[in-house]
Amino acid sequence: MQETLVSKAWPDAPRALDKARIAKTWQQYYEDRGYELWGFSPSPTARILARAILDGNPRRSERIEIVDYGCGYGRDSLYFIELGFDVIGIDLSETAVTLARGAYKQRQASGIPLLGSASFHAGDLHSVFKCRTGQRVRAFFSNRVLHLLSEIDLRDATRDAMTCMEEGAYFCVSARSPDDFNTALMEWIPGKEHEIARYKDPARSGHNITFVTKGSLLRVVGNDLEDMQYTKASEPERVGSPDTHLLILLGRKRGRGSDAATPMEGSNPAP
């Protein structure tokens, strides 16, 4: 899913039910709206990663492989492919993966030159890379997924990400920031004020938002990354919906023996 699952506020059994409920909701979104959910314009997060890679490899002398975690129907994956990157798209939604494969085939048949390649997989990082022992990628990318992971699940996901990344690889993710809290639509989880919100709409029951901050991201990945830069951005939650306010983190996996990273404010121009 473009956005995945889970709340850290509740124990495992209810959390599993919420995960299944949200997965079903996104399956329905993809079945009902398909490519009309976001269109195919690349996200601000994808543009930031692309610019960083291209600036660091101006001659394009090496192949760049990117994991697109929560790839949805492939809108950012296709953007990366057109730039010459190779993509491993991963999503929990089988419907989304089917759509991504279909969009890729349509683009191949359109006559538009594709300098890169892609494969799309239903599952998670662990299941996909279990059969890719020793494989390392040059970049890990995730747009608007991490705010729906519990603290434990977020740590698991980032640990798996670091495992599949080579030293110096780019880590570029976005998630909803506290600026996105909307009193008309959301309410705070008791005891988790200013951290976790839930939607008031009963149709979105269990669809909780764990807002990310620089501090929360630093706690999770600060020991693994260097050259960390944060950027604020916004984009519609879906076509025709209000904007969501995002915090974007761009960093690079620290090599062995590197000193501790110093987080920086920054933004990267889009290509």
Where are the model-predicted features located?
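Short catalytic micro-motifs in class I SAM-dependent methyltransferases
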Residues: R144-L148
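A conserved beta-strand element that flanks and buttresses the S-adenosyl-L-methionine
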Residues: F141
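A short glycine-rich, Lys/Arg-flanked "PGG" loop and its adjoining helix->strand segment in the class I
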Residues: R155-E167
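Conserved acidic residues
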Residues: I64, V137-R138
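Class I SAM-dependent methyltransferase core
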Residues: D68
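Class I (Rossmann-like) S-adenosyl-L-methionine-dependent methyltransferase catalytic domain
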Residues: Q2-I64, G72-R132, L149, D156, ...
